[in-house]
């Protein structure tokens, strides 16, 4: 990167956006020295907003084939990576027995959402300062800490809620079981997770919170019936939990820039 170009760009950005008082540069850690020098020069030139410039130093992303180096021609084009990942998602999905026996047919847009969700989540779940080894096959695993795992849970919740055609009433005297308590507790933590993610400039906090929420809900789902449960009171509380879990998944995914498919 050229200091001269970066100086001009920084000054022009502030000039074009007078309400902006600072900037966060999300750039790989190989440019740490560049930004240290850039910020120092801007401060010496007397720009008072220079104190509000911050380099969010990101770890480098490598592939299983090795480190990407532009000078050696080993850089993978992002469009090519996304295209290949979409095809991998499509092939993997169509090979599943439950997909072959289902009437559900996924379109290209849904495959795209799953592939991009896998890519974004795989990167965002890692602390920004750490290097990332992106494994395409691992990123689309439906049982691990992945974007598709979260997307699938969301689709399943939506499928449950579509079967409900009446208002849900809660019995305030209902005694929650441990699984229900755990999901409610995790939902309650969401606002503080947003704040900490903002304070620490770490989307990884949001991403891993989302995974924990889905794991907690899945544990409830696997151990207890949601719709045809042991009583109308338990059905009602689990539907309320499902609705609120769905809302948090939507909100958190939106903050992470991850789209949610309608079916999987």
Language model features: what each stretch is:
Residues 4-264:
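Non-catalytic interaction-recognition regions
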């Amino acid at each position: 990167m050229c200091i001269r170009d970066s100086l001009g760009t920084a000054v022009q950005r502030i000039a074009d956006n007078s309400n902006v008082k600072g900037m966060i540069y999300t750039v790989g850690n190989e440019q740490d020295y560049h930004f240290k020098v850039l910020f120092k020069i801007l401060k010496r030139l007397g720009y008072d907003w220079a104190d509000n410039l911050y380099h969010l130093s990101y770890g480098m992303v490598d592939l299983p084939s090795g480190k990407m180096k532009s000078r050696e021609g080993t850089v993978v084009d992002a469009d090519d990576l996304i295209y290949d990942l979409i095809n991998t998602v499509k092939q993997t999905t169509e090979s599943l027995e439950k997909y072959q026996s289902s009437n559900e047919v996924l379109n290209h847009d849904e495959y795209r959402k799953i592939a991009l969700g896998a890519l974004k989540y795989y990167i965002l779940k890692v602390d920004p300062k750490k290097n990332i080894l992106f494994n395409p096959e691992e990123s689309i695993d439906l049982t691990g800490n992945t974007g598709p795992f979260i997307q699938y849970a969301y689709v399943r919740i939506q499928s449950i809620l579509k079967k409900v055609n009446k208002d849900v009433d809660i019995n305030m005297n209902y005694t929650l079981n441990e699984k229900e308590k755990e999901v409610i507790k995790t939902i309650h933590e969401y606002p503080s997770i947003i704040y900490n993610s903002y304070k620490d400039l770490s989307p990884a906090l949001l991403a891993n919170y989302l995974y924990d929420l889905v794991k907690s809900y899945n544990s409830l789902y696997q151990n207890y019936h949601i719709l045809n449960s042991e009583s109308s009171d338990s059905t009602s509380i689990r539907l309320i939990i499902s609705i609120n879990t769905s809302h948090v998944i939507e909100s958190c995914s939106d903050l992470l820039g991850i789209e949610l498919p309608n079916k999987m």
